[in-house]
Each structure stands twice: as C-alpha cells, then as structure tokens.
Amino acid sequence: MAKCQVCGKGPVTGKNVSHSNRRTNRWFKPNLQKVRVITDEGKIKRMWVCTDCLSAGKVKRYVSTKVEAQ
C-alpha cells in the first residue's frame, strides 16, 4: 500500500460503527499527492507526499517557469 515518502504515514485500520452499534472493518487512507519535489542535491524527483507534509513545508515543491514568446 502507498505511504508518504517523507513522514512514512500509511493506511491504518479502524471500524465503521452504525447506529445499531454494529462494527465492520475499514481502512483510513492518508491523503497522498504525487508531486515534483526538489531534493537536497538539487534534483527534481516525483514523490508521494501527504498533504500534512505539503502544508507544513517539509518538502520544497518544484514549479516550472515557462517563458512565453512575445
């Protein structure tokens, strides 16, 4: 299963609980995004990163800058 390549967050198990208190198994999956990241060596790499790491600034996201011809 998929994991965040920065913090290691992965899916965990839990229970769905209905109104009658009947329990069934379920998975809680992390919100992973495949983003281009600038590594410590300055290389651009695609990684699976959870949104918690993105919003906390634990990775530096690569943004391409295209120059338009006028």
From Swiss-Prot:
Keyword Ribonucleoprotein: yes
One term under GO cellular component: ribosome
Keywords noted in UniProt: Ribonucleoprotein, Ribosomal protein
Annotated GO MF terms: structural constituent of ribosome
GO BP annotations listed: translation
Record SUPFAM superfamilies: L28p-like
Pfam families named among the record's database cross-references: Ribosomal_L28 (PF00830)
NCBIfam families in the record: L28
Family the entry assigns: Belongs to the bacterial ribosomal protein bL28 family.
PANTHER family hit by this protein: 50S RIBOSOMAL PROTEIN L28, LARGE RIBOSOMAL SUBUNIT PROTEIN BL28A
Name of the protein this chain belongs to: Large ribosomal subunit protein bL28
Source organism (scientific name): Thermosipho melanesiensis (strain DSM 12029 / CIP 104789 / BI429)
Lineage: Bacteria, Thermotogati, Thermotogota, Thermotogae, Thermotogales
UniProt gene name: rpmB
